[in-house]
């Protein structure tokens, strides 16, 4: 079974909720660093700070990550696959030292953040929609990391 219209709608609505509160970006990176403190140096906007502090770069990067997952949901529904819009993503991830376990950390942080953002609208179906879209995006990025 392919990615459904309903799954795409679930991702889109929670994406809109995510964007409405800048604190969601801070939460996302806080969860990442709780799971993988060494990842701090991979993010230019975090490496010289004492902790996760809100900044325009942090907001921009978080919105980019969540937005790419949202775009992946749209691609999955439309075509059944994900093609990266930015051909440099693989090289950037290699340059930053990203390895396979990092994708699992980001996935966990993304899903926990979406659960928090969604509040009483959260469901297993919503979680699965984000999970499937993220996994497809992560697979596309990993393929580009050559």
From Swiss-Prot:
Domain Globin stretches: 2-146
Q: Which residues carry this modification: Phosphoserine?
A: 44
Q: Does the keyword Chaperone apply?
A: no
Top-level taxon of the source organism: Eukaryota
Molecular functions (GO terms): heme binding; metal ion binding; oxygen binding; oxygen carrier activity
Q: Kindly list the places in or outside the cell where this protein is found, as annotated in its UniProt entry.
A: Cytoplasm, Cytosol; Nucleus
Identify the GO cellular component terms for this protein: cytosol; nucleus
| S-S bonds | none
Keyword line: Cytoplasm, Heme, Iron, Metal-binding, Nitration, Nitrogen fixation, Nodulation, Nucleus, Oxygen transport, Phosphoprotein, Transport
Query: Quick one: where is this thing mainly located?
Result: cytoplasm
Q: How is it modified after translation?
A: Nitrated in effective nodules and particularly in hypoxic conditions; this mechanism may play a protective role in the symbiosis by buffering toxic peroxynitrite NO(2)(-). Nitration level decrease during nodule senescence.
Where O2 binds, per the record, is at 61
> Which residues are listed for heme b binding in this entry?
44, 64, 93, 96
Role, per record: Leghemoglobin that reversibly binds oxygen O(2) through a pentacoordinated heme iron. In root nodules, facilitates the diffusion of oxygen to the bacteroids while preventing the bacterial nitrogenase from being inactivated by buffering dioxygen, nitric oxide and carbon monoxide, and promoting the formation of reactive oxygen species (ROS, e.g. H(2)O(2)). This role is essential for symbiotic nitrogen fixation (SNF).
Q: How does it assemble?
A: Monomer.
Q: What is this protein called?
A: Leghemoglobin-3
Species name for this entry? Medicago sativa (Alfalfa)
